[in-house]
Every structure is written in C-alpha cells, then in structure tokens.
Amino acid sequence: MASSSLSNLMLAIHEKKTSSVDLYRPLRNYVTFTYSEREAQLIDDDLETLKQLRSDIERVSDPSPAARRDLLISYYKVLCLVETRFPISPDKDHVNAVSFVWYDAFKQKHKATQQNIHLEKAAVLFNLGASYSQIGLGHDRTTVDGRRQASHAFMAAAGAFAHLRDNESIKATIGPSTTVDVSVECVGMLERLMVAQAQECVFENTIAKGSTPGVSAKIARQVGIFYEEALSALIISPLKDHFDKGWISHVQLKAALFYGEACFRYGKELHEKEEIAEEIARLRSGASRLAEAKKSSRGAPAQLIEAMNTLESSINGNLDRAVKENDRVYLMRVPSPSSLSPLPAFSMVKPMNMTDILDASKEKMFSILVPDSSAKALSRYTEMVDDVIRTQAERLQQASELTRVRLKEMDLPDSILAVDGNSALPVDLKEDVEAVQISGGPAGLEAELQQLRDLKRVNQELLVHTEELLQKEATEDSQFRSQFGTRWTRPQSSTLTKNLQDRLNRFAANLKQAGESDVKIERSVRDNSALMSILDRRPIESAVPTLARPIMSLDATEDAIVGTLKQSLRQLENLGAQRAGLEDMLKEMKRKDDILPKLMTITGSYEDMFRKEISKYDHICEDISQNIEVQEQLLMQIQAQNEEFSTIFNLEDYKASKEKCYKQIQAAIMKYREIKENINEGLKFYVTLQDAITNVKQQCSDFVMTRSIQCRDMIEDVQRQMSGLSFQDHRSSGPYPSVHQPTASSPPPPPETQNPSHPHPHAPYYRPPEQMSRPGYSIPPYGPPPPYHTPHGQAPQPYPPQAQQQPHPSWQQGSYYDPQGQQPRPPYPGQSPYQPPHQGGGYYRQ
C-alpha cells in the first residue's frame, strides 16, 4: 500500500465555540473589595491583558493554527494564575458575576454554562489539542520532513487531550450543565485517535525508506491497535450517539486497514523464512478482516475504500501464490486463525508531556495578589516542612557517617574482598600507578634511553661535520698562502674562526659530560629494574597480597563465616541506598508541596490544614527511623562476625604484608619519576644542543662560502700582479698596498680579538649548549694582517680610498668576530645540569 494513497485521509478536530464574557470588571471589583483600590490599580494592566486574550479567543483574528496554538497556550497559563487568586463560583464572597459558556465541538446545539474556571480551562485545552491536530493535518506528508513534523504535531495534540483528561475533565463536568466533548471518555478517545495518526505518519516514513517487511508489519500493527482503542470508545455510550457515522466508519476502516497491512507485510517476512503455513493463515486473517470492515463502510470516503480494495487485492494475490506453493512443495498444515499468536507490534510514538509547555510558574501576572494571611500562613507552613526535612536529613547523614567510621575501624569491606583476590589499593596510590602506566611504565624506559643515544649520535655527527667545514677551509687557505707568499695578504682562517672553534670545543665538552650523565641514568635503570618491575603489573591490584585461607581447619567453617559476613555487608549497603532514596523522597515531596491555592481559598482554621498537610511526611519519617534501627542491629552483628573472621584468617599478618606492598609500590613510583625526569632533562638538552650546533654550522657554511668567493677574487688579482698587467693608478688608489708600499694602518680588531686571553667561565659539569644569533659575515680587504693589539684609546686608521676595486658585497654584512658584550644570551642556563649526588638532584637538573 503506497503511503500517497492515504495522504489526505486523516482527521482534524474543530475548535469549541464560546460566548463573550467580561472578566475585567468582576475581577477588578473583587480585588478592590478584598484588597484595596491600590492593588486594583496595580493589576489593571494585567486585567487588560486578560481581557484582550479572552477577546482573541472568542474571535478567530488569525486563522493560522500555529498562531491559535500560541494564543491558547498563553491564555491557559493566565487562567492558571487567575485560578489561584480569584475564586470564581456562585459563592457570594467569590467572583460570582462570571459565567463561562462553551458549545460542544461535535454537537454545536449543546452548550455548557458554569461559574467554574475549570470549564474555561478544559475548553482551552480542548481547543489546543484541536489546533495541534490542524497543524498536523496541514503538513505536506509527501516528504520525509513533512511526515515527521505531522507526527510530532499529532503527538502534541494527543498530549493536550491527555492533559485535559487527567487534570480538568472531571472538574469541568460537575453539575447539570456539561458537554460530552470534554468528558473523560471523549478526550480519551481523541487522544488515542491522535496517537494513531502520529504512528501512521511513522509507518508512511517506514515504507518510504524501504524498511524490512518485519519492521513495517510491527509499526502497522501498532497503528491498527491505536485505531482499535479509539473505536472501542466510539461504539459505546456516551460517544456512540454523539459522533457522525462518518467518524465511526473512518476509524473502523482505518483499524481494519492497518490490521490487513500488518498481516500483508508479516506474510512477506514469513514467506522469506519459508513458513508458508503461517503465511497463509495470516493472509486469510487479514483478508477476512478487510472484507468484514467493508460491509460497514457506508459514509466512508471513496479514497479510503479504494485503498482497502488495493490492499485486499495484494493480500489475495500473495495468498493464492502461497497456497499453490504449499500444495505443490511444502504440504504444510495451515493453522486456524484463532490459534495464531497476536501479531507483533512496536510503538514509535506517545502523547507529548504538556507540563512544561503549560507551566505558568514563570508568569508574572497578578504576582502582587497574595493575601497577607495566606502569605503568613504559607511562610509558617514552609518553616514546619523545612524543620521536618532538616531533622530527618541530619539523622540520615549521621547514620551514613556512623556506618563509614565503623566499617573503616573493622577494615571492611577491603579485608573480605581480599579473600577473593580482589585487593584494592588506596585511591591516591592507584591514581599514581595509573599515571605511571599511561606514561609507558618501567618497560618503556628502554625506548626513551634509545632516544637519548640517537640524539647524542646526531649531535656528535653534526659537530664533526661542522669542524670538517672549518678544517677544509683552513687547509685551502694555508696552501694558497704557501703558494703566493707575501702577496696572500688576507687574514688567516685560524684568526677569523677562533670564536667559532671555541664554541665547537665547548659543545664537544658538553657532549662528553652528557654522555657521562647518560651512563648514570642507564646504570640507575638497571640497578632499580627489579624495584620498578612491580609497576608493570596489570592490574596493579594483582601485586597486592591476597588474604590466604587458613592452612589447617578443624571444622572447615571459614567459607560459612565469609559468606555470612558478605551477606551482612550487602544488607548494610542496601540500607544505605534506601536512605538515599528516602532523602530524595523528602526533597521531592517538598518540591511538589504547594498549598498556596488552598491557603488562598480556605475559610476555616489554618492549624487543622497544617496538621493534615504535614502528616503526609509521617510515613517517610517512620521509614527513616526503621532504617536507622535496623542498621544499628546489623552493625553489631557485623562486628561480631568480623571478630571471628579476623581470628580465623590471621588478619593482622595480612595487614602488615599489605602495608609493606604499598610502601614498595610507593618507592618504585618515586624512583621511576626520578629516572623519568632525568631522561626528560636529557632529551630536552640534546634537542637544544642540536639547535645550537645547527646554528653554528650555518655560520660556518656562510663563512666558508664567503671565503671561497674572496679567494677566487684574490687569486685573480695576485695573478695579474705577477704577470705585470697591473696599473700604477690602480695600485695607488686600490685597496691593497704593494710590496714596496708601507702598509696602511689596519682597523682595530673586534674586542674579542684584542683580548684573546679573555677568560671563559669554568665549564660546568654538564654545560648546556650555547646559542647565538647569526651575524652577517664581512671579510676585511686583503692586505697585511691587522694588528691584533691596538693600544687602548687609539683610534683605528681607515683603509686608504679604493677607487677601482670594490669589496665583495657579502663582505659588508658584519664581522666574523663575535665582539664581547654583543652576543645574545644563550637559550639555556650556564649552570651545571647535574647536582652532586648528596644534593639529591636529577642528572639533568639545572
């Protein structure tokens, strides 16, 4: 059956109609008479709002069902506030000038007239359910989202009718002037009808998604059940003569249609399982139900009749096929329909809970209207309730604390758990062990040591490569100096690279010290591996000794003693859970204990009312007293059982061995953390050192490249001089003096070269790697080496002007020298990373 065939075959409820009523003047007069004109003026805006809401309810100003829904919800909340402040009744001291008139939604000639706000609330809830049903019917059920939204709307309609049935129907039908549409029977039927239509939307989505026949059959059967429940109310008094025949026919056909749909789809599943006999019985049952329903289909829509005919044809087709297969192949005996079990059903919907939607507790209207006597009485009653709850809560807390202390004194339940090998660690110790195991545990230390070795090797290789760069450049410079003699006038490599060599030497020293530290760490890991191995036990509780049973037993009663003690502990635990539940019951009862509406309408003595209301807490107080009494007796019983248990199982020796194990685990954790911290210090050191060496290597590479460029230029110039191709003008103005020309004063060397014996700080036991900014490199014009000991205070002489040959651009970027005082602070401290053993520091600690 295609879902589209039933796309418009659902029912919506029409709203009840009402007559105009003036609420403003009677309610204002009541406030003026009961309170004062001042209060009446203060609530005047609220009364105007109420008047406008009632006026909007009377006429349909906005035909949109969603707008009507919102209006009805707002008005219902205000009615809840009116109910608690304005007693509307024929009583002369109440608001007796207001009469509500509402017409039956299904028999509009019938009406109810009451001086009862519950009739007004019941009618508003009825119309709210009707609005939700119209919203559901208005959704486009040819799409997945449309069917889902329609289902939600029908569930909301069912929720509104259920709320009406449970809260207002009985109150609204008291007296001679009532209507059937708000009766318990009618709104109950409407709730089932709306739930059926919500489930039907789910079924349509199930078919559209191509669900399995078994799933579709269960959902279809539940649709039929909901329609059958609605039908059962429609065909009996007082509803059987209240609704049109078309209503009854519609619900009756829908019930039969979805029973047949369930049989049809369940039959498909049976056919796939080759359960042909039951398939035949189910299909016959569905066909019979459809045929029976069609007999009473007078007044039903033609589209619904067509859907039934289509389904009946499909069922008969499958039935004929199944009968032929059974006659030819399976030869199974077909059971009678009466012997079949009920079809499985699965509900996907339920009435929406309207409590939160209709909650008026946050509304501010009429908030000032609380009679003084009622307010004082409410305050006094609240104090009485608080005193009861406070006293009982203290008793419960004391009982729980007493249990905790007594069990701890008896070392329970830990000792009884240890008998079964379920020893437990203290929480803080267990958390420490778990942290160690998460970080890798002792078994993971070897991998971290290998990381140290790898990083050390990388640093050593990087350092060797850097030194080879400088050595190669110095060798080439010496060869050319030997070849060209005094004509090779640029500074020697050893002079320019002294600072770099010093740094590389310090790095080498640091690596040596680090290697010694690594050896100490590895030795510590080896020496303490036995101690730390306990941390690799999983679970760690397996390392804790168990409570051994006695080796010799004369009467073999230890099992009985253990079993009895366990049973007593379980009883004690149940008592604790019961106390928690009792405390929650007290709090929940107080939360729901709202007597303000009663206080605002009572005319008799408050004391009688207080005694009656506070008595509802008595049964919980009695349960608390009984719980505490039973616990006292049980604790005495447990103490006697535990003494016998301790004697038989030698509990004192077990406690001593357990404490020894705890201390061993704690010592292993401390040693692991110490080694782990030292390894982390080493890893951090090697990474920092690698960055520093890489930085120096880059400086050395730049130096070698610049010297190579300078070397080529200088070779060309020297070769020109030697071949007699140089010109005097160029020699006189060039930057390089001739061999017969006095050497111009060279600029003073940087501060570091002026004081080559500048003392470096004493190298620490483990010197962290240095790190310096990468300066640019500038080679002074080649010529005689500059004097490296310029007297203090003597200004350096500039080079003579050079008109012909300009220095290489890269020479202008700075100095190879690292002037003292300009070196940036290293990124690591200069103190020794190791502390002497007697200081208790880690190998790599700064």
UniProtKB/Swiss-Prot annotation:
Gene3D superfamilies xrefs: alix/aip1 in complex with the ypdl late domain, alix/aip1 like domains
InterPro entries xref list: ALIX_V_dom (IPR025304), BRO1_dom (IPR004328), BRO1_sf (IPR038499)
GO biological process per UniProt: endosome to plasma membrane protein transport; multivesicular body organization; protein transport to vacuole involved in ubiquitin-dependent protein catabolic process via the multivesicular body sorting pathway; vacuole organization
Domain BRO1 residue range list: 5-403
SMART domains, sorted: BRO1
CDD domains in UniProt: BRO1_Alix_like_1, V_Alix_like_1
Composition skew (Pro residues), residue ranges: 824-836
A Pfam cross-reference name: BRO1
GO cellular component terms listed in the entry, alphabetical order: cytoplasm; cytosol; late endosome; multivesicular body; plasmodesma
Region described as Disordered: 726-846
Cytoplasm in keyword set: yes
Description of how the protein assembles with itself and partners: Homodimer. Interacts with AMSH3. Interacts with VPS32.1/SNF7B and VPS32.2/SNF7A. Interacts with ELC/VPS23A.
Biological role: Class E VPS protein involved in concentration and sorting of cargo proteins of the multivesicular body (MVB) for incorporation into intralumenal vesicles. Fusion between endosomes and the vacuole will then target the cargo proteins to the vacuolar lumen. Associates with FREE1 and ELC to perform function in the ESCRT-I complex. Binds ubiquitin in vitro. Plays a role in the biogenesis of vacuole and multivesicular bodies (MVBs). Required for the endosomal location of AMSH3. Mediates high-affinity phosphate transporter trafficking to maintain phosphate homeostasis.
Protein name (record): Vacuolar-sorting protein BRO1
Organism: Arabidopsis thaliana (Mouse-ear cress)
